[in-house]
Amino acid sequence: MEARVLLLCAVLFLLVHTPPAAGGLNNKCAYFRGQCRRKCPQRDIFFGFCRNHDQCCLSSLHTRH
């Protein structure tokens, strides 16, 4: 019985502390115009930081000249 309680606590702990998947809405930024990346490509413009501390990169196509 005690082993089951410990196993349940361990599973719940892992579920609570597991980060969400990196796909979907989490990799968008700048009002869904930007892309979260570790480092912006040279052709893109750095806009700020994403929730996961990656750089928010705007394609030069989305910016006004």
From Swiss-Prot:
S-S pairs: 29-56, 36-50, 40-57
UniProt xrefs under Pfam families: Defensin_beta_2
Entry coiled-coil feature ranges: none
One BP term from GO: innate immune response
Keywords annotated in UniProt: Antibiotic, Antimicrobial, Defensin, Disulfide bond, Secreted, Signal
Signal peptide residue numbers: 1-23
Predominant location category: secreted
GO cellular component: extracellular region
Expression (tissue specificity): Lowly expressed in spleen, and lung.
Compartments where located: Secreted
Protein role: Has antimicrobial activity.
Family note: Belongs to the beta-defensin family.
Name of protein: Defensin-B2
Lineage: Eukaryota, Metazoa, Chordata, Craniata, Vertebrata
